[in-house]
Amino acid sequence: MIWLTLVFASLLSVAGQLCQKQATCFVAISKRRKHIVLWLGLALACLGLAMVLWLLVLQNVPVGIAYPMLSLNFVWVTLAAVKLWHEPVSPRHWCGVAFIIGGIVILGSTV
């Protein structure tokens, strides 16, 4: 159950980052203020809930194991950036993502 909490904390953290990115996207001047407030408000909500879940994780998992698992954020953000904003990702970046996943598997298997 705690590992599921860690995954949700990671996903909410990523959602907060993606909302911040969306807040920076261009919109008409007449809608800009509402757009920014909406997306930054969602970002704060996601990041706040992620922090609460993260505290629950830290109560049950050594920080030396739990913290590296947040590297999943790099993986989620890369995938979302490609899907949502069609951002280019170099082969070198994908290689880095693969190393991150490998590291998470290695660290996760030590528990």
From Swiss-Prot:
Membrane topology, record value: Multi-pass membrane protein
Membrane-traversing stretches: 36-56, 61-81, 88-108
InterPro entries: EamA_dom, Flippase_ArnE, Small_drug/metabolite_transptr
GO molecular function, one term: carbohydrate derivative transmembrane transporter activity
Keywords: Cell inner membrane, Cell membrane, Lipid A biosynthesis, Lipid biosynthesis, Lipid metabolism, Lipopolysaccharide biosynthesis, Membrane, Transmembrane, Transmembrane helix, Transport
Pathway: Bacterial outer membrane biogenesis; lipopolysaccharide biosynthesis
A GO cellular component entry from the record: plasma membrane
Domain of life: Bacteria
NCBIfam families listed in its UniProt record: PRK15051.1 (NF011625)
Protein name: Probable 4-amino-4-deoxy-L-arabinose-phosphoundecaprenol flippase subunit ArnE
Organism: Escherichia coli O157:H7
Gene: arnE
